Amino acid sequence: MTIRNVTRGLRCTLAFRTLPNALPVQASLCRVDCALLSTTCARRKSGLKADGSRADQAEAGASQSLDKQSRTLDSVRDDTLSDPYPLPFSPDIVELNSVKTRVEAGLESKWSGVNLASSQQTLNHIDAPMRVPGRDSEARETKIARLIYQTRKRGTLETDLLLSTFAKKELKNLPDAELDEFDRLLDEPDWDIFYWCTQRKPIPARWAHSFNTAGKLGHRLVAHTRNDEKAVRWMPEL
């Protein structure tokens, strides 16, 4: 469009110069074309300036946002987390363990630098994800209530049904050692627990003694899954 206007303006200018006695209409057309050309160029220049200022503003806003986020993460406290006991893949844990927010950055949270989902962590000489800190001093009643909730709200229907009905039947009568063992079992992936209970996958070495020894917690869980009494089961209330 701009090239067409320039060409037309030049033609009118040449015609006006070679024909001084040309009609007034031709002269007015040339003036209109030149005015359009100058207006178009002015608009393009102003548009470039506006785009440049917008880009500068966007860049400044992004840098301010990053600085604000960095300052916020660098001063994260435990009482500001969305969950006082975050799960391994909680967004809070992911943020606290990102490259820019490691423990070397001076974070005040006890969760910084702790990768709860790491398979390299060990617990009681068992190669398993690290336990969520802060649960060592739980009262027995609090632990039982938490475990009942965890068995009902894991997210996999098959595993939820097996674990929650087992918890309703046995959890309150378990000794503290087996209660802690059941707590550690819930740290394992849902489908792994389901396949171990249904004997569709080999039991790993860390749980072999519990699942293969009669009377142990894992062995009783397999018997509960087998449901020899053919009982009708449904999700218990919380």
From Swiss-Prot:
Family the UniProt entry places it in: Belongs to the SDHAF2 family.
The keyword Chaperone belongs to this UniProt entry's keyword annotation: yes
Positions with biased composition (Basic and acidic residues): 68-80
GO cellular component assignments: mitochondrial matrix; mitochondrion
Gene Ontology biological process terms from the UniProt entry: mitochondrial electron transport, succinate to ubiquinone; mitochondrial respiratory chain complex II assembly; tricarboxylic acid cycle
Name this polypeptide is given: Succinate dehydrogenase assembly factor 2, mitochondrial
Gene3D superfamilies given in the database record: Flavinator of succinate dehydrogenase
Organism: Mycosarcoma maydis
Statement: the UniProt record of this protein carries the keyword Zinc: no
Cellular localization per UniProt: Mitochondrion matrix
Oligomer status and interactors: Interacts with the flavoprotein subunit within the SDH catalytic dimer.
InterPro entries: SDH, SDH_sf, SDHAF2
Function noted in UniProt: Plays an essential role in the assembly of succinate dehydrogenase (SDH), an enzyme complex (also referred to as respiratory complex II) that is a component of both the tricarboxylic acid (TCA) cycle and the mitochondrial electron transport chain, and which couples the oxidation of succinate to fumarate with the reduction of ubiquinone (coenzyme Q) to ubiquinol. Required for flavinylation (covalent attachment of FAD) of the flavoprotein subunit of the SDH catalytic dimer.
Segments of this protein annotated with the region Disordered: 47-82
Superkingdom per UniProt: Eukaryota
Keywords: Chaperone, Mitochondrion
Pfam families named in the record: Sdh5
Additional information: This protein may be expected to contain an N-terminal transit peptide but none has been predicted.
